[in-house]
């Protein structure tokens, strides 16, 4: 049996346009509505079955996100919910816990309840997973991705962060301040930033010391605390540290305090994201600001315009900013 995506592909319009046309929305012109209904009949699609199934999904947007425990994802969820509400959508949120199986199930669930649009926040590597890509292709809703860096599959709208330029800015800042022994800490989920860290160091002509790169399974402040403990146990620790994200930086600073050490006098600390706590700790954490508000605003605006027969997906890169505070 044909589905909404088949009709959309046949006519060269968005899935949301097909959905609204079949539901008799006044936002869709009479000519487009007739064209969609004719195509649905030709392909053997049951409009009556669709109306019954879609009732719960009318004017509903889905949000899929890995977790809500970290400040970064909690901020994105709140921003997305507020922006979608302002556009007249009610929202349904699903968590994946960074698991492929949970992501596939979440996408399938959103498709089954016929949400009109779906905002998925995930890492670029995760978004390239074959199971996840296939689930997105089967989904009956318009999809917007928010990812950590460039996403090569152009069939989906995507807002992505230019992580590379941000990390280069951060390392260059440390270099200009005279730091030479620069380390990096991360958890396994954010380990892609270590790869970029190494690339940035090489670009700037700096030496990467393998012993100064610490990765563990623990996340958040606890992960940062434990990784800093490892570095401080060395005979010669680094004189500056890039943390994969701000909550790890906060944990690293706690470990320094326990040893009566301070940033930047004993070790400079730089984070990534610019979460709320980064503005207050230690007089302010130097960090690479992720433009979350811009990301969500652009993403929701594009999703809302999907009903206007826009045919091609968009890939939009946003550059982060360096926020210099007292820890460097």
Where are the predicted features?
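N-terminal helix-turn-helix DNA-binding module of bacterial transcription factors
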Residues: 1-57
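Periplasmic-binding protein-like
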Residues: 115-123, 144, 183-186, 235-245, ...
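Short, solvent-exposed amphipathic alpha-helices that sit
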Residues: 71-86, 166-169, 189-208, 223, ...
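Hydrophobic alpha-helical segments within soluble ligand-binding/sensing domains
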Residues: 157-184, 195, 199, 221-230, ...
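Flexible loop/turn connectors
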Residues: 229-328
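An alpha-beta-alpha
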Residues: 168-204, 211, 314-327
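Flexible loop/hinge segments that line or gate small-molecule binding clefts
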Residues: 121-169, 207, 247, 273-285
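N-terminal helix-turn-helix/winged-helix DNA-binding helices
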Residues: 41-78, 87, 110-112
């Amino acid at each position: 049996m044909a589905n909404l995506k088949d009709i959309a592909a046949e006519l060269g319009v968005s899935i949301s346009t097909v959905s609204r046309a079949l539901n008799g929305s006044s936002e869709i012109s009479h000519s487009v509505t007739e064209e969609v209904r004719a195509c649905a009949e030709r392909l053997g699609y049951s409009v009556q079955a669709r109306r019954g199934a879609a009732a719960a999904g009318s004017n509903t947007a889905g949000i899929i996100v890995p977790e809500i425990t970290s400040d970064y994802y909690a901020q994105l969820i709140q921003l997305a919910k507020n922006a979608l509400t302002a556009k007249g959508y009610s929202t349904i949120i699903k968590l994946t816990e960074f698991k492929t199986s949970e992501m596939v199930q979440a996408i399938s669930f959103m498709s089954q309840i016929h949400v009109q649009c779906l905002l998925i926040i995930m890492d670029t590597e995760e978004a390239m997973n074959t199971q996840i890509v296939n689930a997105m292709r089967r989904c009956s809703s318009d999809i917007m991705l928010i990812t950590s860096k460039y996403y090569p599959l152009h069939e989906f709208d995507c807002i992505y962060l230019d992580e590379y330029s941000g990390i280069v800015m951060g390392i260059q800042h440390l270099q200009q301040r005279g730091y030479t022994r620069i380390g990096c800490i991360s958890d396994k989920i954010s380990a892609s930033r270590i790869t970029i860290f190494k690339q940035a160091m090489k670009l700037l002509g700096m030496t990467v010391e393998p012993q100064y790169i610490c990765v563990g399974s623990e996340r958040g402040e606890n992960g940062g605390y434990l990784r800093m403990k490892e570095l401080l146990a060395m005979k010669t620790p680094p004189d500056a540290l890039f943390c994969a994200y701000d909550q790890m930086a906060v944990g690293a600073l706690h470990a320094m305090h326990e040893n009566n050490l301070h940033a930047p006098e004993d070790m400079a600390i730089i984070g990534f994201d610019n979460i709320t706590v980064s503005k207050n700790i230690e007089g302010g954490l130097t960090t690479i600001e992720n433009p979350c508000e811009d990301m969500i605003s652009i993403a929701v605006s594009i999703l809302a315009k999907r009903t206007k027969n826009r045919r091609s997906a968009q890939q939009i890169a946003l550059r982060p900013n360096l926020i210099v505070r007292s820890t460097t």
